[in-house]
Amino acid sequence: MFVTWRLAGTLPQVPAEVFRRDPHPGRFFLAQDRRLDSTPQGPRWLQDPRIARVVAEALAYGERVRRAYDLFAWVILPNHVHLVLRPQRTLSAILRWLKSATATRANRVLGKTGEAFWQREYFDHWIRSEKELASVVAYLEANPVKAGSEYTGGKTAGATQDHAALRKNVETPGSYRTHSGGRRT
């Protein structure tokens, strides 16, 4: 599954007629994503290496400790995150946890309170073939370059990781542990 979510305040209002012009949601997504990569609208907190690391560590924790998904590839850009994963739980539960855990820690790092960190909605697309998987992963690998982000590895913004590199480069933080139903998850 391919998933994208954005920082709050980074999506401009799009008139409904834009959606009617191109009925293919994938094409519309790619065009919008490329346009939004280069727009300065809204916050760009993910370009801060401390905040990008918060997200990267949560991704690793969600896979290794929570076992919520198998993570194949990911990229953190200045105002949004792309993932390719195989969910082991419902996508809504995965994203609810990821966004909540990362927003709490990122807001603490930034000294922010009382305002949304992430956009409420997210984009998801089921990957239906090996060919499509290769295409989506290639898109993620090229995305930081096309967006003008600096590629610096798994610990900072603009980092694309494959499964093995993720395990090697990102430590699993203990601070993502949560409680659910009286037992540690």
Which ranges hold each PLM region?
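Short catalytic/metal-binding and nucleic-acid-binding patches
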Residues: 1-185
